[in-house]
Amino acid sequence: AAKEQAAADANILSIGVDANQNYMHPGQVLTSMLKRVDLAVYNAFSEGESLTTGFNIMGLAQDGVGYALDEYNEGLVSAEMISKLESEKAKIVNGQIKVHDYMSDNTCPVK
């Protein structure tokens, strides 16, 4: 919340992280990166007694992460931007774009 406030005070856009923070400073938060913990919990409870423990990866294909679009940022995100985002998302989901898995080797390929 502090970074969103600082960005709003400086009249620059920010991006919220983990949950939808667009409402905190309408028109100043470009979007929020969503970590869909709500969906993960719902899915776990839905499995009931058949729940298997361990790692359960929920990426773009499983709607485990995403971005927020709502009345608070609708004027900031154009249809062209959404189209491009969805196109790139589809490329990640279908494997056309490879996203490095940090958990696989504890490294980041970007220096």
Regions found by a protein language model. Name each.
Residues A1-K111:
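A residue-level marker of the well-folded mature domains of exported/periplasmic proteins
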